[in-house]
Amino acid sequence: MEISYLCAARQADVLELRWMQISDKGIFIQQGKTGKKQIKVWTPRLREALETAQAACPKLSPDALVLYNSDRGQFIRKTFNNRWLKAVRAAQSELNRQLDYTFHDIKAKAISDFEGSSRDKQIFSGHKTESQVLIYDRKVQISPTLDRPVIGKK
């Protein structure tokens, strides 16, 4: 989840991530949907997320998956989504409120939280067009208001 958020990566791109995609520069991700190739540059938080993943799923070989199931194979979507729902329920219990989020919402949250122009967000997210980014960017825009004196009021 953390890797997906920090890299604005889709679920499938994270579940298919292999150790040979990890380099000194960052994490190489070729998005399955758009084919966009990016190296997601290291930040301390991204390194920590990868270390957490490695603690749960030790590196088996360069071509091994970064995240794997109990059989050391790739998670199937249904199993992963069940784990996601379990995590959401735990968060609901801890926060004492309903949470209606899907894993796909993580990418939208990442794009919304990323500081910069819609063009910057396009580069970050790997979308082919700015209009695609605008669909994901859910950040409420701050806009100016009209500040004129009332007519006839002194």
What spans do the regions from the language model cover?
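C-terminal catalytic core of tyrosine-transesterase DNA break-rejoin enzymes
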Residues: 2, 6, 12-13, 106-128
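Conserved tyrosine-mediated DNA breakage-rejoining catalytic core shared by Y-recombinases
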Residues: 7-55
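A short, basic/aromatic helix-end/turn motif that makes direct DNA contacts
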Residues: 16-22, 114, 122-130, 136-139
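Catalytic-site neighborhood detector that most strongly recognizes the C-terminal catalytic loop/helix
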Residues: 31-35, 125-150
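Active-site/catalytic core of tyrosine-dependent DNA strand-transfer enzymes
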Residues: 43-97, 110
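Hydrophobic alpha-helix feature that most strongly marks membrane-spanning transmembrane helices
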Residues: 55-58, 89-93, 115-116, 126, ...
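Intrinsically disordered, low-complexity basic tails/linkers immediately adjacent to helix-turn-helix/homeobox/MYB/SANT
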Residues: 153-154
